[in-house]
Amino acid sequence: MKPLSRRQEQVLQATVHHYVDTMEPVGSRTLVQRFSMPASSATIRSAMGALEQRGLLTQPHTSSGRIPSALGYRHYVDCLLPEPAATVLHLERELTGLSLGWAALDDLLLQLARRLTDFTGLMSLITRPTRTQPQLAAIRLVQSGERLLVMLVENSGHASHLNLRLPHATSDELDAIERWAEQQLRGGALNWEKLPTQLQRSGDVLRHALEHPSISAEPTTLVHGLSRLVAEPEFQSAQDLGPLLQLIDDEPMALISPGAEARVLIGQEHPQSALEACSVVQAPYRCGQEGTGHIALIGPMRMAYATACSAVERVARHLELLLS
């Protein structure tokens, strides 16, 4: 495809900014006046026509102005994204006041999601790091009749518990398993092949519970700002909103597109058809041995991409610092 001329790029950028601000189609006269373009209205109108022919602008109604198409937004994000506004510095100052307390990772992620939504006006989503198996720092076993409470403390400080039925275990067995686990974890992980034979009957039950998918498979997904999304004019019909709400409710992880790099997915670029009227701005964050989580902003294609991209990247890097 032939590259855009400098004037065509200026017109596309101005059209995107106008539509994001006003949600109104724009004509050449308004662009000249609002953005002080050094060209006549006829020249700008010609550039808009060329952009429409290339699929970067579209004319929603007869005799109306133009608005960006999904392809136009893509070119804008890839080639014309301006530097983020100075207001992003305000977000950075807010982030410096956050810290990770003992067993408070989910609380921290929720605070970050709230700040992202408040700053951008978009729905935010943050996942806890994915892991194939939790990195344990300690295991505590508490017996109550035929039930066993297993308390797990991970290296990240996150705490969880399991409630198992273990009628045949004795207190001496459980004490021995706890001591064995403590010694094993000093070396980094539990090696069940080294569990003493006399402890294997009770140990096998515990091993099965620790390897159950409820602990290790699907990361926690925190969503904030759904009310902001449904308030957008683009999502006022049940036909547009219904599939999106169902996806958020049933499978929020599907909002994130797999990948190890920051990405902006616009409209039908996203594999989920429920998001074809949306854009998703996402970035990964890494948490040492804990794995990788994701931060994302979801909104209409008509979004302030420079602010959204900058905010997601800054929160991801700040979270990595807190978790390092």
Curated annotation (Swiss-Prot):
Q: Name one GO biological process term.
A: negative regulation of DNA-templated transcription
- Pfam families, per the entry: HrcA (PF01628)
Q: Which GO MF terms does the UniProt record name?
A: DNA binding
Record flagged with keyword Cytoplasm: no
Position of the signal peptide: none
Highest taxon above the source species: Bacteria
Its transmembrane ranges are: none
Q: Which UniProt keywords apply?
A: Repressor, Stress response, Transcription, Transcription regulation
Family per UniProt? Belongs to the HrcA family.
What function does the entry list? Negative regulator of class I heat shock genes (grpE-dnaK-dnaJ and groELS operons). Prevents heat-shock induction of these operons.
Protein's name according to its UniProt entry: Heat-inducible transcription repressor HrcA
